[in-house]
Amino acid sequence: GTWTASFGDQIDVVVSNNDGMGMSMFNAWAKDNKVPTFGYDANSDAVAAIAEGYGGTISQHADVQAYLTLRVLRNALDGVDVDTGIGTADEAGNCLTEGEDYRYSEEERSYYALNVAVTAENYQDFTDSTKVYDKVSKQLDSSKSPTKKVWLDIYNASDNFLSSTYQPLLENYDDLLNLKVDYIGGDGQTESNITNRLGNPGEYDAFAINMVKTDNAASYTTLLNK
């Protein structure tokens, strides 16, 4: 591409903020030229490419991200403490380790999955990016956590990480948490592409909203207030 044509031998290392671009550079130029290339997301193709010389990537702990997304909803629906099944074991035995798997910010009232470096030494542990995390893989009792219906959107259905890793993980967790989820994929450009498919909010018990632009919350809350 343009960078290799312009700089060629001057490029010593390639660092990308996502594996989609990192792998494009690796396959098109860096692999043959033996230039170390690093990405972010730990997508399955990038992890597999480490065996072929891809320098490494960063796992966002997507398995924890997806679990936290649905677990916070599940806890709210069940009327239990928000930390249930997260930092505090639930009755099934699901429990994460704070400081290793996630951190919690009381000020921001937010859970954050913690990043993990994926290298030649440990990449084989990350070859299946859609595998549920063992620590939180136990089925909930449907008599205590009955099936609920959730509307969940992903702002860009074409995003590599969201479509190939995050959504498949959500789909693997929703059954374990007794959630029937309708997944809505946006175009990554306009809020209306998503909100146009929220015409019947009364049909759902909970909503997980991933906005295209972070200042467009009113586009959704206006619909939910009807």
Task: Give the ranges of each region predicted by the language model.
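Extracytoplasmic "Venus flytrap"
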Residues: 16-19, 148-176, 180-204, 208-218
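Sec-exported extracytoplasmic/periplasmic mature domains
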Residues: 4-8, 26-30, 51, 55, ...
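Hydrophobic alpha-helical
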Residues: 1-48, 207-226
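Short beta-strand elements at the ligand-binding edges of bilobed clamshell
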Residues: 52-63, 183
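Short beta-strand-to-loop elements that line the ligand-binding cleft
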Residues: 13, 37-39, 59, 181-186
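Short, solvent-exposed loop/turn elements at domain surfaces
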Residues: 47, 124-129, 159-164
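Hinge/cleft segment of the Venus flytrap/periplasmic-binding protein
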Residues: 68, 72-148
